[in-house]
Amino acid sequence: MAPAVGIDLGTTYSCVGVFREDRCEIIANDQGNRTTPSFVAFTDTERLVGDAAKNQVAMNPANTVFDAKRLIGRKFSDPEVQADMKHFPFKVIDRGGKPVIQVEFKGETKVFTPEEISAMILQKMKETAEAYLGGTVNNAVVTVPAYFNDSQRQATKDAGLIAGLNVLRIINEPTAAAIAYGLDKKVEGERNVLIFDLGGGTFDVSLLTIEEGIFEVKSTAGDTHLGGEDFDNRLVNHFVQEFKRKHKKDLSTNARALRRLRTACERAKRTLSSSAQTSIEIDSLFEGIDFYTSITRARFEELCQDLFRSTLQPVDRVLTDAKIDKSQVHEIVLVGGSTRIPRIQKLISDYFNGKEPNKSINPDEAVAYGAAVQAAILSGDTSSKSTSEILLLDVAPLSLGIETAGGMMTKLIPRNTTIPTKKSEVFSTFSDNQPGVLIQVYEGERQRTKDNNLLGKFELTGIPPAPRGVPQIEVTFDVDANGIMNVSALEKGTGKTNQITITNDKGRLSKEEIERMLAEAEKFKEEDEAEAKRVAAKNGLESYAYSLRNTLSDSKVDEKLDAADKEKLKSEIDKIVAWLDENQQATREEYEERQKELEAIANPIMMKFYGAGGAPGGMPGAAPGGFPGGAPGSNDNEGPTVEEVD
């Protein structure tokens, strides 16, 4: 049984780590990369996840899904979902008030929820860990932005279930990064540490005090919809306008052209973190026009300056909430790829009166590192001294309360309350002889509930007739360590109770839906494995035929073989190669059958050459898939399948 892992499920990239024998290892995927793109692609023949999906995005923009984290746990009507849909090349539709993604897969129209797409990415991270650890991985800690609300957390937990994971805990990304920093630094005395986490799609700021293994979050703030993707969008829009000016054509009407431009913009943005200027060269971008241009760092900073500046508001808020002056912050730790942007580093440094931020931890891996440590702790691994002393105290990011007369929000749990927590308050009826009360639970900071987010509601009925203000109804809020909440109400006179686990009113997937999705995920996994075996059989046959052809052209072999045998074998090889060209989509069994036919002719002929010493199949690549590139998974994405694309 493999140990528990920590998974950073990111908007644009994901990362998995394991903590064992007193050290954390970040695990590379099958392409050798320590982060995996959070992309899932659907084609006519297969489903691709990670690098393979991102690599083919320009050829298949409408069926390549990314940014599921920007949709998860949100309503379709959410203005941010509506704004994102304008940028997405794939189709997002409304199903019961929730956004779902519609794609073409194996010739059919399929619909997937953001939870299912996220589950596919989690499953990929699970498989990456399993390949490295050599066992089944069941338990994981999954991270979310600190500013994720209740429904987004619950939906992320559901995604873990669909991926076949037991989610030990949902933890906040900046808190995970703080653990990575704290363990790495062996912090002495009490330190106030500000974590500034700006990733591909989300932004968090948390202020913690770290002292002797106790990580106490004092306050947190952020924007669940700000990150590197938004900077890419600014660049894309800038170049679309430039293309219009230069060529009088609007390339935004073409999904493929937009995708190629976006990929170039993402690369340019990264280059501008280390160079003052970079060029973009895209051949035949739109209607045969080559697009060659350049951009300076100053221009990029100008295009994004309002977004960059907006990152300081949450910093302000975190310090105010924690009642700490900026001069009392000992360390500023940068997390997330977007903190490599020099302008952002300068803004932070200026804000803290010239104090340089700490860059000692890897911004791409810190969150997975901290999650892996937390996974080791929660799965009871106390073998390491560093983990046995850690205590995490996190907070609820948003105030929680109920609606009282006049549509007012009465807060029971103010924001930045340490969790887990439990709080009760007594309410009463608003009118005489009122038989029941409707309890509506909200999260948010505004005075009126209509400006806050409704999490759920339930009724408490059967209250005996009494004048207003007499019945005593005790409402209890209970927030667990994942930041997910239970609310119960008790009428003290009759002892009647009712309760609700706030799992995103209406939007939450039901148990049946999760089970159906889990079964579907298993089915997709089996299909993926079958496809890998089919490709391996095809590669095996191809490499066997070609290696035989090479053997025949070798002069040593040529001399010793009978002309008739040689002719017979040559024509059979030509026949197989021609058949392969015609049948790229044949079944695994057909390829294996052809391999057997070829072996039946080749083996006796080659036996003559090797004399009695050469056992059948004793030559290179004789066994199916026994040739470089033949093993499943070794070359799935760039093997001989390249010839299918015309």
Curated annotation (Swiss-Prot):
Keywords from the UniProt entry: ATP-binding, Chaperone, Nucleotide-binding, Stress response
Gene Ontology cellular-component terms for this entry are: cytoplasm; cytosol; nucleus; plasma membrane
> Does the record bear DNA-binding in its keywords?
no
Compositional bias annotation for Gly residues: 613-632
User: MF terms per GO, please?
Assistant: ATP binding; ATP hydrolysis activity; ATP-dependent protein folding chaperone; heat shock protein binding; protein folding chaperone
Q: Region annotation Disordered: residue ranges?
A: 613-646
Q: What upregulates this protein?
A: By heat shock.
Query: Which SUPFAM superfamilies does the annotation name?
Result: Actin-like ATPase domain, Heat shock protein 70kD (HSP70), C-terminal subdomain, Heat shock protein 70kD (HSP70), peptide-binding domain
Write down the superkingdom of origin.
Answer: Eukaryota
* Alphabetical list of InterPro entries matching this protein: ATPase_NBD, Heat_shock_70_CS, HSP70_C_sf, HSP70_peptide-bd_sf, Hsp_70_fam
Which Gene Ontology terms describe the biological processes this protein takes part in?
A: chaperone cofactor-dependent protein refolding; protein refolding
A Pfam match: HSP70
Which protein family is named in the record?
Answer: Belongs to the heat shock protein 70 family.
Q: Return the NCBIfam families for the record.
A: PRK00290.1
Name the record gives this protein: Heat shock 70 kDa protein
Q: Gene name, please? A: hsps-1
